């Protein structure tokens, strides 16, 4: 039986991250990922270093960083440092960039930029020398500590990025929602690319960011899942993204998000774009409801061969920031105790 890793995405929050990481580990999660989006949430690297001190087995990483707001050497240095501090528990979740780029007025990275960034990051965190336009560049301090190479997990929404992730990533995580047909489509793209390149299936961990809110009250779960559903639908409809491959339920909303997404309220329940996200879409695109429903819906996805799932959950507390994260972890308790053990 395939051993599935279960992770959770939580924004880092000073004064809370270390304690919540310990709670997350005790709940049975395998991975904690913190977004690297400087205008919307505190710095993940310093907070994850603190989390490394309160945990022993929990894998720690970014969910996600990007190729445009930090130079690759800077990101590699931070990750390799965390790798040494955590005794080799680091995962670098990375995508093309979205809110992190938008809030400083720059474009998100292209798939080609992301590929180059990933390859250079892998080289830096192996202690290798990287050619930076004719300048030999390496982490000179690396030899004295020699931390293990950092696992790079590429977040992918469209077909081009999925194929690139299969080519160069250590892991690939689909960000396509939780509807079975969306995961099946993404998995088919990844498996086809594996066949084309001859890369062994067992050399790549394939997973997904899963929009999931477990709550005895299904309507409450749907309400809490609306923000995540709108955000991930926006990923499918990013500027200039192809829409032809999307199913009808998603295509019209993704097209709306290309011009109607409220980036000022990204990842917030107050986003004006959420008025365009009906209950029926949330229920299809996310897993929202009591434990029995969550187990059934998640089983469908795992039966497709996913090796890991990262929960994108909801919080019943909007602010302040730390209390919001604490409430999100508490909201995940039912999922951790009544759903995850079913798959162990």
Question: Model regions: which residues?
Answer:
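N-terminal beta1-alpha1-beta2 module of alpha/beta enzyme domains
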Residues: 1-62, 150
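Active-site mouth loops of central-metabolism enzymes
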Residues: 3-15, 65-72, 146-157, 212-215, ...
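Hydrophobic faces of well-ordered beta-strands that scaffold small-molecule active sites
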Residues: 4-10, 32-34, 60-63, 90-94, ...
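Short, acidic/polar
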Residues: 13-24, 78, 156-164, 291-300
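Conserved, mostly hydrophobic/aromatic
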Residues: 28, 51, 82, 121, ...
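Glycine-rich, proline-tolerant flexible connector loops at the mouths of alpha/beta enzymes
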Residues: 31-54, 66, 98-101, 176-180, ...
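Alpha-helix-loop-beta-strand connector modules within alpha/beta enzyme cores
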Residues: 45-65, 69, 124, 330-344
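An alpha-helical appendage that flanks or caps ligand/catalytic pockets
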Residues: 107-143, 183-303
């Amino acid at each position: 039986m395939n051993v599935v890793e279960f992770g959770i995405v939580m924004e880092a929050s000073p004064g809370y991250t270390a304690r919540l990481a310990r709670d997350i580990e005790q709940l049975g999660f395998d991975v904690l990922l913190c977004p690297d989006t400087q205008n919307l949430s505190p710095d993940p690297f310093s907070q994850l270093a603190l989390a490394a001190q309160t945990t022993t087995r929990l894998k720690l990483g970014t969910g996600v960083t990007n190729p445009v707001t930090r130079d690759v050497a800077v990101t590699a240095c931070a990750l390799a440092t965390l790798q040494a501090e955590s005794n080799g528990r680091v995962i670098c979740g990375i995508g093309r960039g979205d809110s992190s780029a938008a809030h400083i007025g720059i474009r998100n990275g292209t798939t080609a930029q992301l590929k180059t960034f990933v390859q250079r990051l892998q080289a830096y965190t192996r202690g290798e020398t990287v050619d930076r336009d004719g300048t030999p560049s390496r982490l000179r301090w690396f030899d004295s500590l020699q931390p293990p190479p950092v696992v790079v997990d590429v977040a992918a929404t469209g077909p081009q990025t999925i194929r690139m992730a299969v080519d160069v990533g250590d892991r690939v995580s689909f960000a396509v929602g939780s509807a079975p047909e969306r995961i099946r489509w993404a998995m088919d793209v990844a498996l086809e690319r594996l066949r084309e390149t001859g890369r062994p299936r067992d050399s790549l961990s394939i997973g997904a960011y899963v929009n999931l809110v477990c709550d005895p009250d299904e309507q409450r779960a749907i309400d809490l899942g609306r923000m995540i559903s709108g955000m991930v639908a926006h990923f499918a409809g990013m500027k200039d993204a192809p829409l032809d491959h999307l199913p009808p339920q998603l295509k019209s909303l993704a097209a709306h998000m290309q011009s109607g997404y409220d980036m000022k309220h990204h990842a917030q329940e107050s986003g004006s774009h959420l008025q365009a996200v009906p209950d029926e879409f949330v229920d299809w695109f996310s897993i929202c409801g009591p434990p029995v429903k969550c187990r059934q819906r998640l089983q469908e996805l795992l039966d497709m061969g996913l090796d890991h799932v990262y929960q994108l959950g909801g919080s019943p507390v909007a602010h302040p920031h730390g209390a919001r994260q604490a409430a999100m972890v508490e909201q995940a308790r039912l999922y951790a105790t009544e759903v995850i053990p079913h798959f162990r």
